[in-house]
Amino acid sequence: MNCCAHVLNTVLRNAFDDRYLAQELPDLLEQLQKVKAVVTFLKQSGLTSQLPHGVCQEICTRWNSKLAMIKSVLSQYDAIENLLDSRGNLLLEDVNKTLLTEVAEFLEPFKEASEKLEQDKVVTLPLVLMYYTKLKKHLTADSTDSPEVCQLKSRTLEFLQIKLPIEELHKVATFLWPPFRHLRVLDEQERKGVHDRVRELLIDVHLRLPQGETSTDHPDYEPPAKRTSLDEFKEWRDAAETQPADSELDRYLRDSDSCEDIEKLLELWEAHRRKYRGLSFLAKKVLCIPSTSASSERNFSAAGYVLQDRRTCLKPESLDNLLFLHKNM
């Protein structure tokens, strides 16, 4: 699976490609360039010290820096305008504040999705399908949107559907999050496909697991059954076919147990390891898969800070210990 954070970055980089904006949305490109020029002037002139807060400059390799730049200007727009007017500077004169606000609102859900998917101490794979659906809904043009934002949404939606295909594993992971077990985010055919796939996986899991009681729903003691007239013919009686995969899946679908906090999802499945023996095993196997590689990249960055040109004599175990402390303290 692709890193979802990288995919979102690629989607937005293509959506805000300068060549595309210059041809199709020149007014939007002009507004973004004006904001960038304002931030550059404030930083180079040292005037940021006279503002309530600092301003952020856009970095071409990070789409979220575009949002940070716009918000840093809009949040103190009046203060910046007064400061520039006092110096006879007209950089803000033709800035379309309404359009910039729309662009910020357009980018905000992507920021939320990226931050949630890049968490490294929380299960994130079930969130991929949910945020994908939420972003698709967000990218549906609204009657209140400006023509520029409508076109931007259309282009971004096109790239999102191409670059971020929802895989079977994403759907299974969402199914294993109890509040969304019925997969109402999918249509009926897709739901059936996920259920069929989970049944297949459970059959394989039950073959691998040692035989034994699979549920604590049954009491430890049951009174002996009364003898019936059929007992004398029991050797010829039809055997009831047991299908642990089906019964376990059906019980899970009927269950009312929930887990609103995704941070406790693995704890829930650990607590249900006897009630749902196969599903618990499957959940631990699937939910441990991260949706992004952000955590690994943060560790690589930390390693670069720890192991420097003047600090190359560290033993491998010392480097590992320092990285462990950096990660967990």
Language-model features: locations:
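Short, hydrophobic/aliphatic alpha-helical segments
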Residues: 47-53, 274-289
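Short, conserved catalytic/metal-binding micro-motifs enriched in Asp/Glu and His
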Residues: 65, 114, 173, 177-178, ...
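Extended, C-terminal/distal alpha-helical "rod" segments
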Residues: 80-248
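Surface-exposed, charged/polar loop-rich segments
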Residues: 1-82, 89, 152
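Mobile genetic element proteins and their domesticated derivatives, centered on retroelements
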Residues: 6, 38, 65, 70, ...
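Short coil/turn segments at secondary-structure boundaries
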Residues: 14-17, 74-75, 84-86, 185-188, ...
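Conserved, non-catalytic sequence blocks in retroelement Pol enzymes and Pol-derived host proteins
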Residues: 58-60, 94-103, 116-126, 161-165, ...
